[in-house]
Each structure stands twice: as structure tokens, then as C-alpha cells.
Amino acid sequence: MRIELRSHTENSPSGNPAENFQPYIDIFPVDGVSRPIGGVLILPGGGYIGRSYHEGDPIARRFNELGYHAFVLQYRVFPYTYPAPQRDLVRAVKLLRSMAGKLKLDKLAVLGFSAGAHLAASGTMLAEKFNEPEADFAESFSGKADAMILCYPVISLTDDFAHRGSGINLFGKNTPDEIIGQLNMQNLVDNTTPPTFIWHTANDAGVPVRNSTVFAENMWRAGKNCELHIFPDGPHGVGLGLGMDDVKQWPVLAGKFLHCSAGFTKA
């Protein structure tokens, strides 16, 4: 099942109709459930310029196996710029909440990879900023997820450990660091930040592991619920980590975190 986020398509900033994109959600339900269960809204990575398939549908199927509904959001990327992706995430959360009865959905987590994890954090932690210009039934629901799963996340866009390419693609190449740095997510942790599960590999050459450690440290400093796993070896973008005996355990660990630490119900 697929649902579009809006009844209309917002034109690409490039002015090229071929680059117009209507964001949508692919739905992967757990079949046969008799009561509402938790779900994960998956945000594939791609540096805010693409969306990686291996960080989408295969992740959804794995979380179905773990007893959770799953949803994959195909959000807008460059040439669309901030706040288009964040608006798409918040809209998706609201739409899914508005359909909770039909979907048998209880709590909802966002699960993002790399730049998709930056989107998960920014769209969740700043959800109230990204309302739709035209109100409808879905807009009456909260756009803030109940938990976050951040997989080898881009957290900073401008610090010495930042992934600068994501910031440039999100804001545009001529945007000053003072503007881009407003979405360095480690600086925005507060008492409303939801329970968060993070994992990374120590020698990730694409997005430095410090993105994860700094965010986790700020979560703990704020007294917030955060679980961090650093695996010793692995490249950036490993997705499910198949063929890696340690890394491939992360979905099980994340599923247990949702159930035991964030109060999610599973099938």
C-alpha cells in the first residue's frame, strides 16, 4: 500500500517540471494483528540528494519480522531544500497517526540512516516548526515521533566532525555556516527529545563516529533515555549489516530498545 503525503505536488525549486516530486509512504504492515502495535517510519539516507533502496524496503521487512509495522518515506531531496524534507517527515508522522485505527498502529518511531538520521532528528526535535500551510484532519495530530533510531547518523552539518555535503545539499551551496549550523542537532537536545537508540561503526570514514557520541553525551547530560552501540569495524552505509556478525544484530537491539525502554507494543 502506498499513500501520497499531499493532494498536490509542490514544484521543484529548479523550475524543471521533470524534477517535481510528490513524496509518499510505502506501508509494510504486520499481518494478522488483533490489537494496535508499534511502528517504525524509515528514512533512507543519501546525503539529502538521494535515497538508498537498501536502507528502505529491506529494513521495513526486517522490522516486520521483529513484530513492528514499518513504513518507508520517500521524502524530497535536492533540488528541494530546507525545510522540504523536514516538512515531509512531520506530515508523514501526522498522516500515519490519523490512520492509526485503520493501521492498528500504536506508538511510532522514526528510523533514519546517515542524512536520513539527521532528518529523523531535526524533523522530530523541531516538529512544531513544520506545519502545513493548509490545515486538514491529519494536521490535528502530533508530528513528533515517540522514539528515534539513528543509524550512523549525520548529526552536525558544520563542526570539524560534520558531514558538510549533507548541509550543502539541504540548504544550498551558498548558504553561510551560521544558517546551516542551526541544525547541528547535538545542540538542540532538550527535555522534549524522545528516547533514542543510536549505532555507528568506530572507523566509519563517511560520517565520523563522533556524530553519534556527541549526541549521546548530550542526551545523557540532559537526563534523557539514550542507548548507544559502537561496533569496532565497518564502512559507512552498511544498512542491515548482513555478513557482519556483530553489526547485523542492531535491528534486534533496536527492537528491544523500543519495547523495553520506549514502551512500544509488538506483535
Each language-model region and where it sits:
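Mobile cap/lid helix-loop segments that gate and shape the active-site cleft of serine hydrolases
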Residues: 12, 153-188
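Acidic catalytic loop of the alpha/beta-hydrolase fold
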Residues: 157, 203-207
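N-terminal cap/lid segment of alpha/beta-hydrolase-fold proteins
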Residues: 1-33
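Short beta-strand element of the alpha/beta-hydrolase
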Residues: 37-45
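Short beta-strand/loop motif that positions the catalytic acidic residue
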Residues: 192, 198-200, 204
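Catalytic nucleophile-loop/oxyanion-hole region of alpha/beta-hydrolase
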Residues: 51-53, 58, 71-107, 244-249
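Primarily recognizes the serine-hydrolase "nucleophile elbow" in alpha/beta-hydrolase
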Residues: 91-162, 180
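C-terminal catalytic histidine-bearing segment of alpha/beta-hydrolase fold enzymes
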Residues: 209, 213-267
